[in-house]
């Protein structure tokens, strides 16, 4: 009887272990989760779609929470790969995070299509956002109070824009919005608004103006002549290896095979 009970116990433990192993090797092992920058939506969405098409049974997810949230998510183990539209800060690197530049993206300065202004210098943009220039007539436009639209604190797009224009902690925003899409929609609906957004996400509902005579485009970002640009970064942990599926995705998106997909999505591949 004791031998029988012992055998039953061993079988029960074995069954439990098998169930656990199956759970670990099931859907979670065949999935890739990303979290972060809303500016990277078009690029990462296209890459995820291509990866799923080439790998039957694999699930790819993207959570558009913003760069700061995506960095926190990977640091806390809540996703496989974080997405940031800015370089990591020293304190983030000190947490054991590492970054890989996936692509480069222009930050387009956008206005309503009805606005006659088509070019501003970097200095004028800084003066507008810090409240030194408040009316469009001061920069060759129609008479109208300038409405400043920007992103929320923690946004990689905001960090890049303010760093390049030298306006950190000095912008006089009317609205601070939580996504690239919201900025574009708001500027499209207000003739006096100005905003900034990922070049890869800009639609014909707004007008991307030139900066210092240089229009934002893939070619001007690539040759460096367009002044307001930043990296699209993949964030991972140094001390935690990716799952086989997540590593396969990482290798795919950073390979030469992904360059055309990234380009078609409006960014400039880093490799």
Describe every region a protein language model picked out:
Residues 25-68, 72-271:
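Exported/periplasmic ABC-transporter solute-binding proteins
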Residues 1-11:
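Bacterial N-terminal signal peptides that target proteins for export
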Residues 14-18:
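Alpha-helical transmembrane segments
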Residues 19-23:
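C-terminal motif of bacterial Sec signal peptides marking the signal peptidase cleavage site
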């Amino acid at each position: 009887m004791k031998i029988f009970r012992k055998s039953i116990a061993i079988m029960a433990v074995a069954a439990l272990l098998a169930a656990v192993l199956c759970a670990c090797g099931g859907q979670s092992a065949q999935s890739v989760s990303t979290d972060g920058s809303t500016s990277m939506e078009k690029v990462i969405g296209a890459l995820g779609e291509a990866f799923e098409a080439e790998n039957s049974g694999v699930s790819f997810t993207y959570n558009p929470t913003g760069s700061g949230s995506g960095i926190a998510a990977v640091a806390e183990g809540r996703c496989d790969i974080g997405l940031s539209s800015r370089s990591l800060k020293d304190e983030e690197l000190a947490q054991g995070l590492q970054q890989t530049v996936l692509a480069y993206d222009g930050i387009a300065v956008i206005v309503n299509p009805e606005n006659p202004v088509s070019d501003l210098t970097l200095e004028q943009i800084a003066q507008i956002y810090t409240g030194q220039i408040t009316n469009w007539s001061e920069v060759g436009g129609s008479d109208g109070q300038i409405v400043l639209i920007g992103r929320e604190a923690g946004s990689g797009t905001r960090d890049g824009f303010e760093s390049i224009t030298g306006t950190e902690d000095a912008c006089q925003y009317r609205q601070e919005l939580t996504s690239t899409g919201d900025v574009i929609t708001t500027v499209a609906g207000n003739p006096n608004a100005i905003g900034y957004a990922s070049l890869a996400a800009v639609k014909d509902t707004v007008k991307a103006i030139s900066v210092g005579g240089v229009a934002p485009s893939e070619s001007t970002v690539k040759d460096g002549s367009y002044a307001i640009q930043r990296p699209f970064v993949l964030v991972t942990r140094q001390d935690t290896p990716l799952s086989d599926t997540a590593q396969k995705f990482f290798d795919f998106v950073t390979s030469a095979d992904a360059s055309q997909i990234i380009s078609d999505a409006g960014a400039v591949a880093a490799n």
